[in-house]
From Swiss-Prot:
Main location: secreted
Top-rank taxon: Eukaryota
Descriptive protein name: U-scoloptoxin(02)-Er1a
Its job: Antibacterial peptide mostly active against Gram-positive bacteria.
Organism whose genome encodes this protein: Ethmostigmus rubripes
Disulfide linkage: 30-52, 38-58, 42-60
Note: This toxin has also been classified in the scoloptoxin-02 family.
Length: 68
């Protein structure tokens, strides 16, 4: 009983860790590699341009982005 409870808790902790890593993946891209990696990821996955915003998150946008 105790062993199965430990396994269950370990599995839940692992799932939470993996989910957190997936949810924050874009933030990791910007903090580690910057705009170049963000732009490459957006180009490959979404056929769009990308850049890191002021919050450090990778943001994808259409290639014909207007600059102000």
């Amino acid at each position: 009983m105790i062993v199965s409870l430990r396994c269950c808790l370990l599995l839940v902790a692992l799932l939470i860790t993996v989910e957190t890593a997936i949810m924050s993946k874009r933030d990791i891209v910007c903090s580690v590699s910057g705009d170049v990696a963000c732009n490459l990821e957006c180009e490959l996955l979404h056929k769009k341009k990308g850049s890191c915003d002021e919050n450090g998150a990778c943001t994808c946008f259409n290639k014909k982005r207007e600059t102000e």
